[in-house]
Curated annotation (Swiss-Prot):
It comes from Glycine max. Glycans are attached at residue 52. Coiled coil: none annotated. This is CASP-like protein 1D2. Homodimer and heterodimers.
Amino acid sequence: MASTDKPGGDPEYRTSSTPAPAGVDYFKFDVILRFLLFAASLVAVVVIVTANQTEVIRVPQPVPWPAKFRYSPAFVYFVAALSVTGLYSIITTLASLLASNKPALKTKLLLYFILWDALILGIIASATGTAGGVAYLGLKGNRHVVGWNKICHVYDKFCRHVGASIAVALFGSVVTVLLIWLSAYSIHSRVPK
């Protein structure tokens, strides 16, 4: 069967001698956002770890009763998750700095960043949610369950530290979402149109 194609071939399937577009280079913003993620993780961990407070509670007789982050598994998970996030942000900041000088490595690295950033976002969000749930119980209590009374009127310094740490971790979650969007947009801008 004879081909009915024109000598030039189908323009849609023709190979181009021009290279693919370089795309928009946002690696400087990527480094800044990754540094912000590190700072947010570090601040959140330091603030919650220093949230120790001891108050005298009057049960039949006065007893000193401490409140520490390590007494709640949710807060321990929060500290562990944000510590992992801080380490991850250091590693990826260094990788971004090294890749900024090597254009061939940038696109592949962006794809890996999207995948790992999404995983880290899940870790940060789950840790912030669990710590936020426990903090809310400390603030408001649960009148439907015996023994789940509010404690923030007694342990005010501890609750302020926990609340501030959760707020900073929430900022870290937003920074991670921005990192994912930035990487996705950078990859999208590199796709030939």
